[in-house]
């Protein structure tokens, strides 16, 4: 049974044609991308590394990592989004290998094949995030890096990420997030530990509405990033 929610896949497929419009529904991802890219690169030193981007969608992060000199594979089960990613890669001249395959299936096929695994803004959209974390741990080489980002589950995150971002500021389409699937850092830490990974750093992501920009923060109450390593 595939670890995917058909409703979630359809939701992102319906918006596929807007992935690369920096002023449309995916504007927050475009604004966030430089922050997460520089954070990932600071840890993993991307040039020359073999990377798999799980839940890559339209390829915003995948392409930016490839632009830094990484050899990137992007996987997703939203085939319309992958089609957009493929087309944009051809237009930009930035080479990324895209494939419609589940993380668990790729892990079974290519265990220990990647220096870096990224799984950003994806765990809160699947029925079993622990299985995705385990697949990431299988995919990464000993000594390699695994990066996650997701949303904390508390009243503040509900008010800011759901009510604020989707209904008041309208930064995101209504229904983008299901609060019940948000993941507390302690829960993600348990998934990471059970998968045999070591958590190296956790950082929050703050949004500054007046400047309309994202920045790293020590506040993990809403959006947060986690860097992990597999033992050598």
UniProtKB/Swiss-Prot annotation:
Q: Which reaction does it catalyse?
A: a 3-demethylubiquinol + S-adenosyl-L-methionine = a ubiquinol + S-adenosyl-L-homocysteine + H(+); a 3-(all-trans-polyprenyl)benzene-1,2-diol + S-adenosyl-L-methionine = a 2-methoxy-6-(all-trans-polyprenyl)phenol + S-adenosyl-L-homocysteine + H(+)
Question: Has the keyword Methyltransferase been applied to this entry?
Answer: yes
One record GO biological process: methylation
Gene Ontology terms for molecular function: 2-polyprenyl-6-hydroxyphenol methylase activity; 3-demethylubiquinol 3-O-methyltransferase activity; polyprenyldihydroxybenzoate methyltransferase activity
- Keywords on this record? Methyltransferase, S-adenosyl-L-methionine, Transferase, Ubiquinone biosynthesis
Similarity comment: Belongs to the methyltransferase superfamily. UbiG/COQ3 family.
Name-wise, this protein is Ubiquinone biosynthesis O-methyltransferase
């Amino acid at each position: 049974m595939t670890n995917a929610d058909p409703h979630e896949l359809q939701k992102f497929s319906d918006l596929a044609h807007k992935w690369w419009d920096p002023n449309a529904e995916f504007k927050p991802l475009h604004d966030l991308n430089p922050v997460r890219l520089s954070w990932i690169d600071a840890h993993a030193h991307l040039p020359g590394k073999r990377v798999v981007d799980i839940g890559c969608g339209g390829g915003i992060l995948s392409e930016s990592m490839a632009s830094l000199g990484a050899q990137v594979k992007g996987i997703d089960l939203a085939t319309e989004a992958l089609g957009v990613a493929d087309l944009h890669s051809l237009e930009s001249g930035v080479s990324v290998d895209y494939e419609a395959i589940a993380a668990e299936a790729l892990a079974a096929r290519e265990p220990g094949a990647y220096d870096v695994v990224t799984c950003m803004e994806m765990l809160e959209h699947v029925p079993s995030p622990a299985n995705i974390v385990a697949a990431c741990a299988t995919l990464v080489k000993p000594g390699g890096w695994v990066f996650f980002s997701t949303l904390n589950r508390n009243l503040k995150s509900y008010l800011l990420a759901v009510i604020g971002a989707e209904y008041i500021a309208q930064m995101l389409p209504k229904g983008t997030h299901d609060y019940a699937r948000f993941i507390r850092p302690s829960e993600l830490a348990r998934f990471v530990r059970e998968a045999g990974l070591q958590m190296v750093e956790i950082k929050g992501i703050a949004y500054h509405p007046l400047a309309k920009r994202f920045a790293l923060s020590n506040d993990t109450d809403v959006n947060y990033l986690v860097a992990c390593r597999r033992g050598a």
